[in-house]
Each structure stands twice: as C-alpha cells, then as structure tokens.
Curated annotation (Swiss-Prot):
<protein>
    <recommendedName>
        <fullName>Large ribosomal subunit protein mL42</fullName>
    </recommendedName>
</protein>
<comment type="similarity">
    <text>Belongs to the mitochondrion-specific ribosomal protein mL42 family.</text>
</comment>
<comment type="subunit">
    <text>Component of the mitochondrial ribosome large subunit (39S) which comprises a 16S rRNA and about 50 distinct proteins. Component of the mitochondrial ribosome small subunit (28S) which comprises a 12S rRNA and about 30 distinct proteins.</text>
</comment>
<keyword id="KW-0689">Ribosomal protein</keyword>
<keyword id="KW-0809">Transit peptide</keyword>
<keyword id="KW-0496">Mitochondrion</keyword>
<feature type="transit peptide" description="Mitochondrion">
    <location>
        <begin position="1"/>
        <end position="32"/>
    </location>
</feature>
<dbReference type="GO" id="GO:0005762">
    <property type="term" value="C:mitochondrial large ribosomal subunit"/>
</dbReference>
<keyword id="KW-0687">Ribonucleoprotein</keyword>
<dbReference type="Pfam" id="PF10210">
    <property type="entry name" value="MRP-S32"/>
</dbReference>
<dbReference type="InterPro" id="IPR019346">
    <property type="entry name" value="Ribosomal_mL42"/>
</dbReference>
Length: 139
C-alpha cells in the first residue's frame, strides 16, 4: 500500500496557479487564510509542499534538519578549582542564611498580639498533645 501512495510535490509556480487562478483575465484568490513565505537559508528545517489527491488542500512538510557534529561547539565550562565566582554550595549557604535572618527579624509575639488584638498565647506553637486526632478529610 505504501508503494501505491503518490506524493505530489509541486513547484512554486504550480502552487501559485492553484492559489491564485486567473478567471476572465482577472486574478482570483481561492483562499484568504493561507499565506506562504519562503524561509531564510539559515533556518533549521527543509520545507516540502504537496497537494492532496482531491486538490483542495496544500500540505506542508517541514522536518528539522540534522546538524552535523563538526558544526557544533562545546559548551564552555569554567574550571571549578580556579573559578573565583560563587560556587553552587556558596549560593545555597547564603540563601539559607538570608532565610534564617529574615525569620529572626519578624515581629515578636507581643507586637503580634497588639497588632491583632489577641492574647500572647495564640502566637506560641501548639504541642503534639493539642493536635486534632480526627482532622477533616480532604475532598
């Protein structure tokens, strides 16, 4: 069956004839939604146009072109021993220190109780003995 399939690859001129037929000496446009513009030469795909067997649909096949290994460049990786920039561990440590400092700078329990007009006991953490043994089930 695959051998019986016919591939209709057409030239640009034939496609333009189908898109813009001439009727009574005037140019007549068949489809208003479709446009075709040639791709630049350095674009990473090859374009093939075809027409379906009923002649009503133009099909565009554009697979990406494989780039040979000789044309690629390696990603530059700095030497971690002699690199003066921050290492990953240093960045994580500074972020952790920032979070700890941020928690210490927050308002104290007395300030919170004054701001929200509550007692100071509301802002202390509850122990395990006050944990709800029958929490509501998630829906």
């Amino acid at each position: 069956m695959a051998v019986a399939a016919v591939k209709w690859v057409m030239s640009k001129r034939t496609i333009l004839k189908h898109l813009f037929p001439v009727q009574n000496g005037a140019l007549y446009c068949v489809c208003h939604k479709s446009t075709y513009s040639p791709l630049p030469d350095d674009y990473n795909c090859s374009v093939e146009l075809a027409l379906t067997s009923d002649g009503r649909t133009i099909v565009c096949y554009h697979p990406s072109v494989d780039i040979p290994y000789e044309h690629t460049k390696p990603i530059p990786r700095p030497d971690p021993v002699h690199n003066n920039e921050e290492t990953h561990d240093q960045v994580l440590k500074t972020r952790l220190e920032e979070k700890v400092e941020h928690l210490e700078e927050g308002p104290m329990i007395e300030q919170l109780s004054k701001m929200f007009f509550t007692t100071k006991h509301r802002w202390y953490p509850h122990g395990r003995c006050r944990k709800n043994l029958n929490p509501p089930k998630d829906r």
